[in-house]
Amino acid sequence: MITAENYFSLENSMAYMGAGQYKAFCECEAGALAEVTGNYERETTVSMLVGSYVDAHFEKTLDLFKAKHPEIFTQKGELRSEYKRAEYIIERLERDSMFMKYMSGEKQVIKIGEIDGVPFKIKIDSYHAGKVIVDLKVMRDFEPIWKDGLKIPFVEAWGYDIGGAIYQAVEGNNLPFLISAATKESEPDLSILSVPQDRLDFCLNQVKENVHRFADIKRGLIEPIRCERCDYCKSTKILTEIVDYRLIA
């Protein structure tokens, strides 16, 4: 049985695919496999912790988060400036009745299911049973992002639409998927964003096309491809040839 305590365990990470894990495999198969098997741990940045601080508040697990992350405090026991900013973001969000309405669902609901025969697990931030799935996201800003030479909406750049497709498929009732979004700007912006069903359908088809390969990689049936760009690939890189500098982009 998957619980909040063992949701991210190595055992469950091997047994189930998740939205974050799927996206990690899309970025770098070798790095994702190393994480799943416990051979590599991605660095936790201050920016990530600020987002996690806001998440923990709405999950009602902030005290536990603070206990697990003493680095967010100064030697005097005060919150560091970045987390005071997180407190301000929280205060701003709680002033908005519409934002809070969508964040008022059942918190951190764990569900398991299958996508094209591959086991998946999800954890929903705010679940309104029979009505809507809501995912909380805190980011730098709402501006489009350059990716692979194209300027695309941040929802697509960060794969939030892919996560929504996975959540909807595993939940199983074809519920609308919304993003409760907030920014880390000096004056936080906020929005409730919908992801159209045709986009979710497109993303789900992509998941179905890729997920069997990723599952086979986890089972050791296929050798993972290295991206040679991520921190994992840099940390395990072995030089085998001299490279013309003009080929380095």
List PLM regions with ranges.
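Mg2+/Mn2+-dependent nuclease catalytic core
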Residues: 104-105, 109-205
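Metal-dependent nuclease catalytic cores that hydrolyze phosphodiester bonds in DNA/RNA
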Residues: 1-124, 225-231, 243, 247
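Metal-dependent nuclease catalytic regions and adjoining charged, substrate-binding loops involved
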Residues: 83, 90, 154-156, 166-249
